[in-house]
């Protein structure tokens, strides 16, 4: 891949880079490629699957050491941040103009920063070599602001040991092309599980909070081939005919005891039920959750049932972004570090594998030996529109789970609930613009 920066040239070369203070006016500054520079790098606990370093901070230290060995004029100062309070720390740093030079994150926050003119665009990245969906998710106004390194779909999972014991594995779509199945086939499976053992929840549809809410949203969207937004991600459209049919089916299945009693439960409860064998399937699953919640039994990834014949997936995208801190030398050094962690012959692939994600590069496939990971890796062409970056996304999320609670509790009909949700959710877009 063509390198992000073109500063790796003769020592006497001087380049120009557009930069300025965070959120301020851009101006041209000269860059000395050999000047000693210090940059800061913040990272969440992302890299926990390296064979040598199991802790993110240890892996990041090794990554930095390897980078500094190749770039002795650049020193990288590192800070690990947690998923709990990390986002607040970043916002505080932005307000106090002490934002890190490099952050490894996801588009939800990154694109919000790009919209506020806080980031350096990655104009030299060859986007044609990257997964199109990942590029779209990482861009703002057609400019790339996060270098997508890893992608992974959110899908469903089944405890095959449990279904073997119950004698219902034959009702799963494991031998069908793409493992695709219809709503009718899925319902037949759920009813069979319930009939074999009433103490086991066939699937747990949870809706207490926004934690893991991509699972229920993708579940409802898929059933009859709707989606949360239009393909341009300009408005919410889940109240179309197929979206209403999907939520009507969920209400019916919920009342019949096929989807558990999840009004007062959230994602962690559903995953714990799956992990402990109290639920046969989970509607929130990914390579990452498989490692943490299905290590004790034989699991299989499952597509969402979709009567169109092929499921669509919400998905994770992860990668580094660069804050514009008003220093051209720091920005240039940060680009070198970003390029190293993604494209270095050794550390690019190692960083990706340490995250447990699949590559956003079109030509980097087959990284894992597991049959299940190979299956999940092949789903990238079924990613749906990535709407996590839509303006007002955070305010939409409580509207969703409150609406679904009302439907399941019988306080509103699926159509009435979805119509009001879409009207209110579209207001959050306008309010955020």
Predicted features and spans:
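Short helix-initiation/N-cap motifs at beta->coil->alpha
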Residues: 80-89, 179-185, 262-275
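Alpha-to-beta junction loops
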Residues: 74, 94-105, 119-120, 199-200, ...
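Ligand-binding pocket segment of bilobal, Venus flytrap-like solute-binding proteins
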Residues: 238-297, 333-340, 346-349
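Long, aromatic- and glycine/proline-rich binding clefts that accommodate carbohydrate-like moieties
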Residues: 302, 350-402, 406, 430-432
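Hinge/lid segment of periplasmic solute-binding proteins
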Residues: 82, 106-155, 161-164, 184-185, ...
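Extracytoplasmic/periplasmic substrate-recognition and gating elements
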Residues: 69-70, 75, 255-256, 293-356, ...
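Helix-loop-helix "hinge/cap" segment bordering the ligand-binding cleft or interdomain interface
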Residues: 69, 138-211, 227-262, 326, ...
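Conserved N-terminal structural module of periplasmic/extracytoplasmic solute-binding proteins
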Residues: 2-111, 127, 308, 329-333, ...
């Amino acid at each position: 891949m063509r390198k992000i920066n073109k500063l790796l040239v003769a020592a006497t070369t001087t380049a120009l880079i557009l930069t300025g203070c965070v959120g301020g006016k851009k101006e041209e500054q000269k860059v000395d490629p050999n000047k000693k520079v210090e940059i800061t790098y913040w990272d969440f606990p992302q890299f926990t699957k390296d064979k040598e370093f199991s802790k993110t901070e240890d892996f990041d230290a090794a990554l930095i050491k390897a980078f500094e060995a190749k770039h002795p004029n650049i020193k990288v100062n590192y800070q690990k941040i947690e998923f709990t309070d990390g986002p607040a720390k970043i916002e505080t740093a932005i307000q106090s103009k002490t934002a890190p030079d490099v952050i490894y994150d996801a588009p939800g926050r990154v694109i919000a920063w790009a919209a506020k003119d806080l980031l350096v665009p990655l104009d030299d990245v060859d986007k044609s070599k990257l997964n199109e969906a990942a590029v779209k998710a990482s861009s703002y106004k057609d400019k790339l602001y996060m270098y997508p390194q890893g992608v992974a779909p959110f899908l469903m999972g089944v405890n095959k040991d449990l279904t073997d014991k119950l004698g219902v594995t034959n009702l799963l779509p494991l031998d069908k092309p793409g493992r695709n199945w219809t709503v009718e086939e899925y319902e037949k499976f759920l009813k069979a599980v319930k009939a074999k053992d009433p103490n086991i929840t066939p699937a747990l549809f949870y809706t207490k909070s926004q934690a893991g809410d991509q699972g229920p949203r993708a579940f409802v969207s898929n059933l009859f081939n709707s989606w949360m937004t239009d393909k341009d991600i300009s408005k919410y459209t889940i109240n179309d005919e197929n979206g209403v049919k999907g939520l009507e089916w969920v209400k019916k299945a919920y009342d019949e005891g096929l989807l558990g009693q999840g009004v007062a439960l959230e994602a962690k409860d559903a995953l714990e039920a799956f992990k402990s064998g109290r639920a046969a399937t989970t509607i929130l699953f990914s390579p990452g959750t498989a490692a943490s919640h299905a290590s004790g039994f034989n699991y299989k990834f499952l597509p969402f049932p979709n009567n169109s014949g092929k499921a669509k997936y919400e998905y994770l995208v992860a990668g580094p972004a660069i804050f514009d801190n008003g220093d051209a030398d720091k920005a240039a050094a940060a680009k070198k570090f970003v390029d190293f962690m993604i494209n270095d012959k050794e550390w690019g692939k190692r960083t990706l594998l340490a995250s447990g994600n699949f590559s956003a590069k079109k030509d980097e496939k087959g990284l894992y030996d597991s049959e299940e990971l190979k299956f999940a890796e092949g789903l990238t062409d079924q990613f749906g529109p990535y709407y996590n970056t839509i303006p007002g996304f955070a305010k939409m999320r409580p509207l969703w789970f409150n609406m679904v609670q009302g439907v399941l509790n019988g306080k509103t009909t699926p159509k009435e609930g979805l119509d009001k949700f879409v009207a209110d959710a579209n207001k959050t877009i306008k309010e955020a613009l």
